[in-house]
Curated annotation (Swiss-Prot):
Residues 386-397 have a biased composition (Gly residues). Residues 1-21 form the signal peptide. GO terms for molecular function: extracellular matrix constituent conferring elasticity; identical protein binding; integrin binding involved in cell-matrix adhesion; molecular adaptor activity. GO terms for biological process: aortic valve morphogenesis; cell adhesion; cell adhesion mediated by integrin; cell migration; cell-matrix adhesion; elastic fiber assembly; negative regulation of angiogenesis; negative regulation of cell activation. This is EMILIN-1.
Length: 1016
């Protein structure tokens, strides 16, 4: 995306420069005319005051805007690179290891800046702005002419209202050049449109890649870290770069031609002025109009290009936002799936979701439908005998039940099912949020549905009556048909039977459709009943909350009244205490005044006078003021103490009043929060009721559509002429089915008798088993007694063994007797064993060397040597390969022994030895190839056609990655392999070249075997 944006902006800059060369910006300021505004269209002639002579008087400063680009750091990206060893281990086992590195990511930013540029003033041209505009025609007049109306200046500097252009004449060569320039601009516009189409195609591919990435993320597959980019994107980018380079070259050529044309126009104007002065108001020429159109087209192309760039940027931003939104959506979906899985694990189905009466009716209906289906199946199996016998009898079988009675029973059951739901709807109270308005509408819709069902049942009853009459006529016709000789009407009977079979199948399908429709209606009634029950529960909870709110409001009003009464009491008490305190203060002031007057009137000394010889202690100790009369006197102290006590009571009253007010404020705040919660709960209940109302409306609409479809089907069935005949034959088949049902009933009774006999035999078997169990219990008891007896016998044997052991320990030998006479000599015994060997003797002298012996016999021929297998292979790649993984070299050039698998690209060593392995990997141009040679899933060697890239962040950062030149990657090494080792080439990055001629080859051969590797 970055190269595409960079080249597009570069193209827009070139087009802007070309437009600027054709038309100068209107903001120009002359530094020598003394005017601060823009220059007049007439140039120097429009000014009355003469311009000062200066060398640079024809140059003006213009404020221009430029778009500059800069390289900014855009975060850090990670990339994976292969390394043979871990970090800091010089010697390590040769295995494939990948390491993740960080490197800065850069982006190209664009900014519009203003700059001052020196250009030729309006009306001047040339390389050094020395070419002045052409003077006016006619003799010079001393009186100044009125200034012309300002107009938009053209390229030559003359005003648009002049009758002649300032080019000094237009020749055929100039018109041809202008026409060529116009054609070139048109071709450039077409190329820009083609480039826009290519960019749109690239954006489409980007959208496909984004969609594929999202699908991969949803499916749980991840792209490998070292996977290469798509080759189609690189090829498209290379093509875009090539086209942009061509456009750059053409724009430069056009810019040069425009410069030459401007210079030529300037020279022509100067020469034309010397030959024939042009009038002051010359009309614009066709060349000027063409140049103006060229300027407009260039500006439009630039604006379109900039708008396209902005659109691509916005589209890229939208794609990024969509990716983020899809990631968030994926995360929310996964979270929801986990939540649903947890709910499914912890959730148990309700014990009773439906009424037992409704379940019983549904079970009975299903049972009857199963009976009908089974009867039809039995009929199709025995149609040869049963139908023939029934047709020969020519009458109705016993137990005949018409289809009308069955449909009427189904209708009664459906009405009985809808009855409780209608009663619940009638007894349902009105609810807020439009529930009271919805319930009458729903009741009306249910009544309409009931009327429609009644109409349908009436029409079906009438048609069934007609069908009964037609069935009777058909049975009589069938009896007349079957009354003849059996050999004459065999073909007609077979046709009738086949037609009956087809019609029976059709009737069965129609009955199943009717049953499914009734089942759907019953399910809808159940759903509506469940919805009504849920609404009733919600309204009940809302009523409880409203009652609780009423109680809370009443309590709140009572507490407000009590607080108001208490406030009134406190105000009265405070006013009374205030009056009493003010009166006490007045009395205290009067008493203080009287005391002050008494002190002033008192002239007698309080102490006796001292004599001249009296000491300091003659007069006795001085007396202090009386207690209670130091500040206040009389009863004023007690009054103040009483006033202080009353004020303390008032303060305590105010404190309790403040506490009560705080509690009241807290209660009011809690009531506000409760009211807010109740409001939110009410809003949720109203929204839930509205949702349920909408669902009920949708369900009613759907039911109306279904009944409308049922009516249309009924009308279509009524228009069918052969339906009555089919139903008549179906009625006859139903009569025969009743006969079959009677036979099945007899079979059931016989089976019941057999089952009763089996139960009797089972009871006898149980009795015999009980007797045998009693005998087995006796045997088990006898075995228990036998065990006790065996234990006693074992103890007796143990006692006997102990006694025998004691007897064996006793010495039973008697005293020694007298010695007897000597006996005769015995026989000679056997020889004794050999003694130990003696010490070796001394070595004798060595004898002389004997003569050579005769030649020995020829040995037996040895076994033949083990055959060495011939192992060699060579394979090439003929199919495109760009995905990372093992490269399957499918075109086999040589495969001695068949140890190379072309489908997987893996070579398996048959025996241990030294093998020569080589591979030549050819990549696409401007795209490097990176691969690894693996031995038994372990990397042995690595090749990178782009060259060695140092590891680390100290490399010089670049704004964009340059395409690497396409080179070869070659493997050639000798490896020791054991029997069963596998060797393959794993592609890490890039795209391999494929063709009929071998470009990418993988080869190997056995050099010699090594038995030591087998024992290693």
């Amino acid at each position: 995306m970055a190269p595409r944006t960079l080249w597009s902006c570069y193209l827009c800059c070139l087009l802007t420069a070309a437009a600027g060369a054709a038309s100068y910006p209107p903001r120009g300021f002359s530094l020598y005319t003394g005017s601060s505004g823009a220059l007049s269209p007439g140039g120097p002639q429009a000014q009355i005051a003469p311009r000062p002579a200066s060398r640079h008087r024809n140059w003006c400063a213009y404020v221009v805007t430029r778009t500059v680009s800069c390289v900014l750091e855009d975060g850090v990206e990670t990339y994976v690179k292969y390394q043979p060893c871990a970090w800091g281990q010089p010697q390590c086992p040769q295995s494939i290891m990948y390491r993740r590195f960080l490197r800065p990511r850069y982006r190209v930013a664009y900014k519009t800046v203003t700059d001052m540029e020196w250009r030729c003033c309006q009306g001047y041209g040339g390389d050094d702005c020395a070419e002045s505009p052409a003077p006016a025609l006619g003799p010079a007049s001393s009186t100044p002419r009125p200034l012309a109306r300002p107009a938009r200046p053209n390229l030559s500097g003359s005003s648009a209202g002049s009758p002649l252009s300032g080019l000094g004449g237009e020749g055929p060569g100039e018109s041809e050049k202008v026409q060529q320039l116009e054609e070139q601009v048109q071709s450039l516009t077409k190329e820009l449109q083609g480039l826009r189409g290519v960019l749109q195609g690239l954006s489409g591919r980007l959208a496909e890649d984004v969609q594929r990435a999202v699908e991969t993320a949803f499916n749980g597959r991840q792209q490998p870290a070292d996977a290469a980019a798509r080759p189609g994107v690189h090829e498209t980018l290379n093509e875009i770069q090539h086209q942009l380079q061509l456009l750059d070259t053409r724009v430069s050529t056009h810019d040069q031609e425009l410069g030459h044309l401007n210079n030529h126009h300037g020279g022509s104007s100067s020469s034309g002025g010397s030959r024939a002065p042009a009038p002051a108001s010359a009309p614009p020429g066709p060349s000027e109009e063409l140049l103006r159109q060229l300027e407009q087209r260039l500006q439009e192309s630039c604006s379109v290009c900039l708008a396209g760039l902005d659109g691509f940027r916005r589209q890229q931003q939208e794609d990024r936002e969509r990716l983020r939104a899809m990631e968030k959506l994926l995360a929310s979906v996964e979270e929801r799936q986990r939540h649903l899985a947890g709910l499914a694990v912890g959730r148990r189905p309700p014990q009773e979701c439906c009424s037992p009466e409704l379940g019983r009716r549904l079970a009975e209906l299903e049972r009857r439908l199963d009976v009908v289906a089974g009867s039809v199946t039995v009929l199709s199996g025995r149609r040869g005998t049963e139908l023939g016998g029934a047709a020969g009898q020519g009458g109705h079988p016993p137990g005949y039940t018409s289809l009308a009675s069955r449909l009427s029973r189904l209708e009664d059951r459906f009405n009985s099912t809808l009855g409780p739901s209608e009663e619940q709807e009638e007894s349902w109270p009105g609810a807020p949020g439009g529930l009271s308005h919805w319930l009458p509408a729903a009741r009306g819709r249910l009544e309409q549905l009931g009327g429609l069902l009644a109409n349908v049942s009436g029409e079906l009853g009438g048609r069934l009556d007609l069908l009964e009459e037609q069935v009777a006529g058909a049975m009589q016709a069938c009896g007349q048909l079957c009354s003849g000789a059996p050999g004459e009407q065999d073909s007609q009977v077979s046709e009738i039977l086949s037609a009956l079979e087809r019609r029976v199948l059709d009737s069965e399908g129609q009955l199943r459709l009717v049953g499914s429709g009734l089942h759907t209606v019953e399910a809808a009634g159940e759903a509506r009943q469940a919805t009504l029950e849920g609404l009733q529960e919600v309204v009940g909870r809302l009523q409880d909350r409203v009652d609780a709110q009423d109680e809370t409001a009443a309590e709140f009003t009572l507490r407000l009244n009590l607080t108001a009464a208490r406030l009134g009491q406190l105000e009265g008490l405070l006013q009374a205490h205030g009056d009493e305190g003010c009166g006490a203060c007045g009395g205290v002031q009067e008493e203080l005044g009287r005391l002050r007057d008494g002190v002033e009137r008192c002239s007698c000394p309080l102490l006796p006078p001292r004599g001249p010889g009296a000491g300091p202690g003659v007069g006795g100790p001085s007396r202090g003021p009386l207690d209670g009369f130091s500040v206040f006197g009389g009863s004023s102290g007690s009054a103040l103490q009483a006033l202080q006590g009353e004020l303390s009571e008032v303060i305590l009253s105010f404190s309790s009043l403040n506490d009560s007010l705080n509690e009241l404020q807290t209660t009011v705040e809690g009531q506000g929060a409760d009211l807010a919660d109740l409001g939110a709960t009410k809003d949720r209940i109203i929204s839930e009721i509205n949702r349920l109302q909408q669902e009920a409306t949708e369900h009613a609409t759907e039911s109306e559509e279904r009944f409308r479809g049922l009516e249309e089907g009924q009308a279509q069935a009524g228009q069918c002429p052969s339906l009555e005949g089919r139903l008549g034959r179906l009625e006859g088949v139903c009569e025969r089915l009743d006969t079959v049902a009677g036979g099945l009933q007899g079979l059931r009774e016989g089976l019941s008798r057999h089952v009763a006999g089996l139960w009797a035999g089972l009871r006898e078997t149980n009795t015999t088993s009980q007797m045998q169990a009693a005998l087995l219990e006796k045997l088990v008891g006898g075995q228990a007694g036998l065990g006790r007896r065996l234990g006693a016998l074992n103890s007796s044997l143990q006692l006997l063994e102990d006694r025998l052991h004691q007897l064996s320990l006793k010495d039973l030998t008697g005293p020694a007797g007298e010695a007897g006479p000597p006996g005769p000599p015995g026989l000679q015994g056997p020889p004794g064993p050999a003694g130990p060997p003696g010490s070796p003797g001394k070595d004798g002298q060595e004898g002389p060397i004997g003569p050579p012996g005769p030649q020995g016999e020829q040995g037996v021929e040895g076994a033949p040597a083990a055959p060495v297998p011939q192992v060699a292979f060579s394979a090439a790649l003929s199919l495109p390969r760009s995905e990372p993984g093992t490269v399957p070299f499918d075109r086999v050039l040589l495969n001695d022994g068949g140890y190379y698998d072309p489908e997987t690209g893996v070579f398996t060593a048959p025996l241990a030895g030294r093998y020569l392995l080589s591979a030549v990997l050819t990549g696409h141009r401007h795209e490097k190839v990176e691969a690894v040679l693996s031995r038994s899933n372990q990397g042995v060697a690595r090749v990178d056609s782009g060259g060695y890239e140092p590891e680390g962040l100290e490399n010089k950062p670049v704004a964009e990655s340059q395409p690497s030149p396409g080179t070869l990657g070659v493997f050639s090494l000798i490896l020791p392999l054991q029997a069963g080792d596998t060797v393959c080439v794993d592609l890490v990055m890039g795209q391999l070249a494929h063709s009929e001629e071998p470009l990418t080859i993988f080869s190997g051969a056995l050099l010699y075997g090594d038995p030591e590797l087998e024992h290693a």
